[in-house]
Design a protein with these regions (language model features):
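Extracellular glycan-modifying ectodomains
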Residues: 1-234
Length: 234
C-alpha cells in the first residue's frame, strides 16, 4: 500500500496499551509480552516503506501520573487521546497553537470490558470526558454514517450513556465507514484506517481537515483503492 501511494503523506500511530505505559503497576512477576521490541521493529519497517511512525510512548510516559487509560477498560481516556493528538499534530505539521477546549464529564458510571470480563474491581466506575473546542473560530462538523445513511452534527451519541457500552458515546461505536465534513479554509482530505481507539482521537483532527474519511477494516468490505480516488485523498 505504501509503495502504491508513495505520492501520499502516510502516517501510522499505534496505541500502546496500559501494560506498556504503566508497567510499574503490574503485579510482581506478571507475564507480559515485550511491546517495545514489537513497536520498534514495526517503526523501522514502516519508516523504510516511507510511512512516518508517530510514537506516543515517551509522551505517555511523561504523563503517566494522569489518567491516560480507563481503570476498567482497555481504551485510552479522552485525555490520553488528546496527548496522542498533540504528538500526531507535530508529525503531521498541524498548528495546534489556537486549540482550546472545555473538558466536560458526561458520565461517572462507565464500567469497561476489562472489569466486565474479569470480574475484578466490579464495583469501580470510570469517568468519561469529552473535550469541546472553544473560541470564536470553532467550525461545525457534519458526520455522515455511510452504511447507515444517517447524518449527525455531533461526534457523540449520548444515548449510549444509558447502555452498558458507554464508550460507544464516541461516534455511536464502530462503523465500516464514517465521513466527517468541516468547512475549513484548507481543502484537504484525511483517510484514517482505524480501530476503536480512534473514536475518541479523531474529533481532535476535525478542525484541521475539510474531510476525514474513517474506515474500520474490520467491517469495511469496499474497494479501498477506489475510495481513495473518489475522495481525492492526497
Amino acid at each position: 500500500f505504501a509503495q502504491r501511494h508513495s505520492d501520499m503523506k502516510q502516517y501510522a500511530l499505534i496505541a500502546p496499551n496500559s501494560v506498556n505505559i504503566l508497567s510499574n503497576k503490574l503485579p510482581a512477576f506478571a507475564p507480559v509480552q515485550d511491546q517495545n521490541s514489537w513497536l520498534n521493529n514495526l517503526s523501522d519497517s514502516l519508516t523504510q516503506a516511507g510511512v512516518t511512525f508517530i510514537d506516543v510512548r515517551d509522551t505517555f510516559k511523561d504523563h503517566k501520573m494522569e489518567d491516560l487509560y480507563y481503570h476498567t477498560d482497555h481504551h485510552w481516556t479522552t485525555q490520553g487521546a488528546y496527548y496522542a493528538y498533540l504528538q500526531a499534530a507535530k508529525a503531521m505539521e498541524i498548528d495546534t497553537s489556537a486549540d482550546t477546549y472545555d473538558k466536560a464529564p458526561v458520565t461517572r458510571s462507565f464500567q469497561g470490558t476489562l472489569s466486565a470480563k474479569s470480574g475484578f474491581r466490579s464495583g469501580e466506575k470510570d469517568e468519561i470526558d469529552v473535550f469541546l473546542p472553544t473560541g470564536e473560530n470553532v467550525l461545525a462538523s457534519v458526520i455522515n454514517y455511510v452504511d447507515e445513511q444517517k447524518k449527525s452534527a455531533s461526534f457523540y451519541d449520548t444515548d449510549k450513556l444509558d447502555t452498558r457500552d458507554k464508550y460507544a458515546l464516541f461516534f455511536g461505536g464502530n462503523h465500516a465507514q464514517v465521513k466527517i465534513s468541516t468547512p475549513t479554509e484548507t481543502d484537504n482530505t484525511l483517510l484514517v484506517l482505524k480501530d476503536s481507539y480512534a473514536n475518541s482521537f479523531v474529533p481532535f483532527l476535525a478542525q484541521h481537515y475539510r474531510k476525514i474519511v474513517m474506515v474500520d477494516p474490520r467491517y469495511y468490505y469496499g474497494d479501498l483503492e477506489q475510495l481513495i480516488q473518489v475522495e481525492y485523498v492526497q
